Amino acid sequence: MTTIKRRDTDFAAYALPVARAQGLLALALWVFAMLLLTAFCAWFEALRAVAVIIFAWWIWSSFYVFRILPQNGRKMLRARGIEYSIGARNHPRLKTLLQKGSTNVGVREPEGYIQKDASDDANYNVRIAGVTPHWIAVGQGATRDLEPPELDCLALRCLVHARLGHVARLDLINRVRQMPSANRVLVWPISLYASLLHALWLAHAESNADRLALLLVKNPKLVMSALLKDFVSHHNLLRAKGVGFDDVETHLKSGGLLEKSGAQMSAQYALGNALREDAAFNARLNALTTWVNSPEYVSALETLA
């Protein structure tokens, strides 16, 4: 037990501190903005009732999004039956990964569920959500089309997010993103916080998850492949152009160079263009590549071996 605890401390130490700093900044700006708005309305006697409403709305929306929605989500997943849960019988590899990975990372083992989107069978989400104990929802498309090591890699990233305390904020961003516009207005204080997190914190949090997942997997090509396939599976324009997982593998093997085949060239061009346009994701890949080629990465592997 002592050895595991010491290893966890060393493991988390390789996360860049900028993510924590930016997360605190987003929280501070959100609290300051809400208190300032409440105080401004309370300053004027005619608006004091509005100030009370704003403050109550802030508390209610926070409780609703951070507590009620996650609890309802867990109940819905549990209600689907044991055939949708990740267990030793139906998904033994993934279940073993969650058990051993949780111990290695130093978090409580999350509940695991297979998620089938009613409107789209090709659901490739691999995400962690909820309040402790967390749960991991894996799309049926991910279990079907991703290579098992790639699915393992994405699941380990979820455990890393849990280790770094990212789950509540990631869940918040995802829930607000999926809400209709009218619902976002109803929880506008939380929508403001989600916007601040997305602008200031999200990219750094994802980059840290990439770094620490790589320390667990110890295979840069596998991590890159998993990240790129996750990117393609959630990029509507690439899917519409027929860019698939085979094109990701071709892209990695060719080092980003265009192939001679017309169909391959078109797919590679579309993928390369999408990567250039998504500055945040491209920066994550570049940062990961830089770190892999650095002495710090080699030293980290030796320390955690």
Protein language model regions, located:
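Short, charged cytosolic
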Residues: 1-7, 131-144
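A hydrophobic membrane-anchoring feature enriched in long, contiguous, low-charge segments
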Residues: 39-43, 172-196
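An active-site-proximal "capping" alpha-helix that borders the catalytic cofactor pocket
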Residues: 98-102, 152, 158, 202-223
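Active-site-proximal gating segments in proteases and membrane effectors
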Residues: 109-133, 184-186, 192-194, 216-305
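Short pre-active-site segment immediately N-terminal to the catalytic Zn-binding motif
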Residues: 138-153, 200
